[in-house]
Amino acid sequence: MRISALEGCRVALWGWGRESRAAYRTFRAAFPKQPLTLFCTIAEATEVQALADPVLSIETEVSVPRLAAFDVVIKSPGISPYSPLAVAATAAGAHFIGGTQLWFAAHADTDGVVPGAVCVTGTKGKSTTTALLAHLLRAAGHCTALAGNIGMPLLELLTPQPTPEYWAIELSSYQTGDVARSGARPVLALVLNVFPEHLDWHGSEQRYINDKLSLVTVTRPRIALLNAADPRLASLALPQSDLRWFNRRDGWHVRGQVVYRGDRAVLDTALIPLPGAHNGSNVCAVLATLEALGLNAVALAPAACNFHPLPNRLQFLGERDGILWVNDSISTTPHATLAALDCFLGRCRVAVLVGGYDRGVDWECFAARITRKVPLDIVTMGANGPHIQALLAPLAAGRFGLHAAVDLPQAVALARTALGAQGGVLLLSPGAPSFGAYQDYVARGRHFAILAGFDPEVISSISGLGIA
């Protein structure tokens, strides 16, 4: 559905996050006098009323009959279509679309392809990978947009001037289905990895995997680029796309800490400001993307050394009193926490803070791995903290310290005490979402920075968003 098709329709917005705000501005720019209804919270309604929009109706209670009363409901990506309310509304005739769906439909050419669109998804690493891709495309002299789930809704760049040559677009599992439903196809779709996350939104592990992979299985990109080291991805067959791989010995891969193209050594990852073996894989993904687009990836690889890392992703805040503070607030799965720990274990003393919102993710894998290479201390916190504590308690004796905190300030205090005068690394890598305690992972990371004694404004901005 294109935006023009909304003219004369009964339209509602459901949610008032950043994506919905962008959808509101887009709708109002196209149809200044057309009535619009917004379903939002009471707190959000106060903010929205300040817009003084005479043809905007605000409702703070949402129901099946009200949703079904509209021709189209533009839904915030954070609202699950699998929730009982959304399912019942759909059965009653409600038609939901998303802002990402509107953008892709608006930009598709006559063949259904969105020129220059490179979509990046994966359970972890997608923000860093998308930003690094934009960085290297710009280093090659190409006007490139960096947008999507990374922090700039696509609808904020609906009709940019000049039109970018490339679009580096990060997509969450909430948004990949939007692309599939738009009928549009990206030039290239990159999938980094897939393991269980967002089970509360998707309802099951298999549905999460299906929704995530719809970017390549349903959307049919011209080029599908997959991680050969991921078992779920390695088994895919995509006959309607040009299927490419990274993390294979005959292509882009990492040996030790060096990035190779086949047998040719190209780049030492120690020169790139992205710690961890997982980031070496992300670099390979970006270079394989550039190559698939027909660019000289080998020549562009050194420009990765000038990349500015993103906040809240293994972000080195600085050192205070012998303690190196590392903010990995983006970590929302146990797999991500294990990857963060791998950057430090065996090299220095580490106290790690884990736990947060409980969405039913299994921590058994964390417990199994943590005994092989142990940190100095683990501090649990948040709603799933007691569950993690119970899993780790039988393993801790004589191996690592284990403490329980009620919140982040107490967790930080316990970790500082554990590190003591000898110091070490104090790592926030929760392996769980921030909901319930914070608005989002950014707010959690900012609070961590304050507790560490650093200015949250300095460490929170993402450079390069938009078009450059």
Curated annotation (Swiss-Prot):
Top-rank EC class of the record's enzyme: ligase
Name of a matching Pfam family: Mur_ligase_M
SUPFAM superfamilies linked: MurD-like peptide ligases, catalytic domain (SSF53623), MurD-like peptide ligases, peptide-binding domain (SSF53244)
Protein localization: Cytoplasm
Alphabetical list of InterPro entries matching this protein: Mur-like_cat_sf (IPR036565), Mur_ligase_C_dom_sf (IPR036615), Mur_ligase_cen (IPR013221), MurD (IPR005762), MurD2 (IPR043687)
Known EC number: 6.3.2.53
Protein residues bound to ATP: G122, T123, K124, G125, K126, S127, T128
GO biological process: cell division; cell wall organization; peptidoglycan biosynthetic process; regulation of cell shape
Keywords (A to Z) from UniProt: ATP-binding, Cell cycle, Cell division, Cell shape, Cell wall biogenesis/degradation, Cytoplasm, Ligase, Nucleotide-binding, Peptidoglycan synthesis
Any one GO MF annotation of this record: ATP binding
Protein's pathway: Cell wall biogenesis; peptidoglycan biosynthesis
Gene Ontology cellular-component terms listed: cytoplasm
Cystine crosslinks: none
General function of this protein: Cell wall formation. Catalyzes the addition of L-glutamate to the nucleotide precursor UDP-N-acetylmuramoyl-L-alanine.
Cited NCBIfam families: murD
Family: Belongs to the MurCDEF family. MurD2 subfamily.
UniProt protein name: UDP-N-acetylmuramoyl-L-alanine--L-glutamate ligase
Organism: Xylella fastidiosa (strain 9a5c)
Gene expressing this chain: murD2
